[in-house]
């Protein structure tokens, strides 16, 4: 007997299917389901009178043969596709993406459900990989709470707390600080990795930081990013298979952007805030987007360009870089970094895939909880101002969505050598997953999973008779408590440090994971974000020309994903 359902009725019961479209929050962005792994009439759903019951959708298989958790009928949005599927999680990892059910009585089942299987209802929800923020100033540990609640599950950067050096630079300097920060990482339900200070002209001060556990090194102009320091730092990185991140020389004291590029010598490097408002050769650091060995990212205060962007940056910059507004030279330094023309061009370079990643610059000219929001606000602004991208059309923005989601998931993972563990929703990877109601997509996740266990969720009054009564707000769940914390989150270190046994020497509880393949990455590896234009910046007008085209756009006067969703 066959029952025909309308698309609306089907979507309300099992979530959208192939050809259905979903609006992302209150933006103008629409995604369309490209494939449905489930089978019509054989869908599984949990609840009273539903399918996942003993002898029906639940089989008799033992724990070894079934997942620990399934997310049913979810819409997956990832760099590789936009699909509807059931997601299986086993031993903290994504085990399969496919069709769940009871293979004894149902056709086409690729994921067997058993008595050992927990169910998370994904009907009508969007699932993305946990975000990766690669520009963290570890100024206050409370940043981690904000980041996790926003959908970020991995934080990479440097610092030691609210020290003056950390307020300005993302460096955890020296073996002693590195050991202490790695020990502190055991207390937080998020994946962490730390960058050492890369500013030295001889290798040993850098090698000892890698040996102590640094996943890479950070070159910052406030410590002196000279060509000699750049060359030495990259040489150490090549020898240790670690990444280098750089904040270049805003004042052009030791050379211009061409001098910095020459010091790279074709070696891989991650350029932070590549537009320059966050720091870097004024006014033309954007030129490095055309280099094959440069992996460029933005920080979120300039994302997207709005009528308020310029006004907030001056005071923000003065505080972050320990400048004095009463000193003319300090004021000139600050003003040289804030250029409306290059900020406007930054929007377009993101939309065209020339800027590959987006990060926060947390508490140091950036907002740790707004990486994901500002990524999608930029995508919306570009859709409104520039129309559909090639490959998209009137029906959907699938390619644009894949391009933008890659900026804070897979591309940062590839850049920093952790893509074998995190950064996408693929079998074998750590199950760091974020569930969103479409109306709140990118803004307020419903639930965040770490290593296959619920870490943070929107939860109502714990004394209520059901989970939903007010006040509903983000609360930490069982993955953040006791021994579960150390078994659901990762600490990334260098291979050198892992081989030297720092986990035992430091007494670390979390699983440590060595970074790898950091030195053979090129711009071509930046998924959906590999464009290498030839860029010039007029030194007087700051006009940005990319492959002969003037890049300019108007500032936004209103944005989605903003006051509609927040009381304050």
UniProtKB/Swiss-Prot annotation:
Record's subunit section: Heterotrimer of UreA (gamma), UreB (beta) and UreC (alpha) subunits. Three heterotrimers associate to form the active enzyme.
Record InterPro entries: Amidohydro-rel (IPR006680), Metal-dep_hydrolase_composite (IPR011059), Metal_Hydrolase (IPR032466), Urease_alpha_N_dom (IPR011612), Urease_alpha_subunit (IPR050112), Urease_AS (IPR017950), Urease_asu (IPR005848), Urease_asu_c (IPR017951)
Pathway it works in: Nitrogen metabolism; urea degradation; CO(2) and NH(3) from urea (urease route): step 1/1
Gene name as annotated: ureC
Residues with the N6-carboxylysine modification: 218
Entry EC no(s): 3.5.1.5
Keywords from the named record: Cytoplasm, Hydrolase, Metal-binding, Nickel
GO MF term set: nickel cation binding; urease activity
Requisite cofactors: Ni cation
GO BP term, pick one: urea catabolic process
Chief site of localization: cytoplasm
GO CC list: cytoplasm
Family to which this protein belongs: Belongs to the metallo-dependent hydrolases superfamily. Urease alpha subunit family.
Compartment(s) of residence: Cytoplasm
Amino-acid positions noted as binding Ni(2+) 2 in the UniProt annotation, renumbered to this chain: 218, 247, 273
Annotated active site: 321 (proton donor)
Recorded superkingdom: Bacteria
Name by which UniProt lists this protein: Urease subunit alpha
Post-translational modification: Carboxylation allows a single lysine to coordinate two nickel ions.
Binding-site residues for Ni(2+) 1, renumbered to this chain: 135, 137, 218, 361
